[in-house]
């Protein structure tokens, strides 16, 4: 199957694209787009990869599911398109950046500026039916995104993995902590942000590690 995805990722993921689960997944996703509203827009499904080639990845931030309301999701976890109000988790992310780094809350919740610096903003599930959180879970996306993380874990080192919440921490449990920095805390959701997300200083810790390993820090 010819999948439109950034070339450096494509060459590594071709074996995945040939597997039965992936063909079943794509058939399911195509039918979902045909029958109703699905987010993100089709051309944005693999945006995280387009903006962050394999060899440029410095930070991996694992999310779970795309936003499921109009205009929000555009292929990067936690990010929303320009002009869209910030969802609660993103509000809390910006609050932590302000507390950690002293940076004011930005005008836009579009995190493409992070992706273009080497932050892979990867949801475990890359599509969702409108207004139905989790509606495309357990259809195959998780297997695909596991393969993505395995390629990074096997071929690259000195990457910062940011794992917020139990789901992301389970998904990243196999990552080698001696060759990478793995940062874990509660999720920025209002349900859990006060149980360990606020004050985690993950943004400064990530940059300190990047500098220590000879890399350029991220302008969060």
PLM feature spans:
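Generic N-terminal amphipathic, Lys/Arg-enriched alpha-helix
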Residues: 1-13
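A polyanion-binding, active-site-adjacent surface
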Residues: 3, 15-163, 167-170, 175, ...
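Short, conserved glycine- and acidic-residue-centered signature motifs
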Residues: 199
